[in-house]
Amino acid sequence: MKLKPPMTMMDFFLKSEGTWFSQRTVHHFDSAQDESGKSNILVKVLTKDDPKVIKVCEQQKVNPALAKGGASFNWQDNLDHGEPNPNYSAILVDIPDSQTGRTGKFLRNRGYIESIPVVSRYHFTNDGVLTIDTEYEKNQGQERCWFLTDDFRVRINTVRMMNGVNLMAYCSERRCITRKQLEEIVQKNAARS
């Protein structure tokens, strides 16, 4: 089956909904040592009338009627199965430029590089690669993300800091199946034998 990449931010959020296992490598272009790690990313799609979406719009003085919807992102340690820590979460709200939805901005209640509310610009290329550009108070960030399959995606981040230090991160992310999905697979396989 041929992959149909998302071409709007809401399609991207919908395709991303669920839990993802993320393996990350960060390369520092100064004297700092490179880093690597594993985590889970939990994504939940939010409708345009969700109170979290409206709150982010109001905090950033944007008319909530312009929002198409949003998503909540939570990060947690790979082996942590408890409730996500709210300090490792963000709400993103989609504000497309036009009806095509291929370009626009999204509002974040908390930035990725600096933990402050921020507005990012995004666009999708013809082959479905999402590029996000963010200007922070002291840094600039760019993220590119694309799906290789419905259950595997890649993210590349670059950060340019005011002190001249640059870093780059590479993430490969695999969709995790839920316990219910696993039980359904086991039942199907048991029925075949």
Curated annotation (Swiss-Prot):
Its EC number is 4.-.-.-. It comes from the Bacteria. Keywords: Lyase. One of its GO terms (molecular function) is lyase activity. InterPro entries: Calycin (IPR012674), CpcS/CpeS (IPR018536). Belongs to the CpcS/CpeS biliprotein lyase family. This is Chromophore lyase CpcS/CpeS 4. It comes from Trichodesmium erythraeum (strain IMS101).
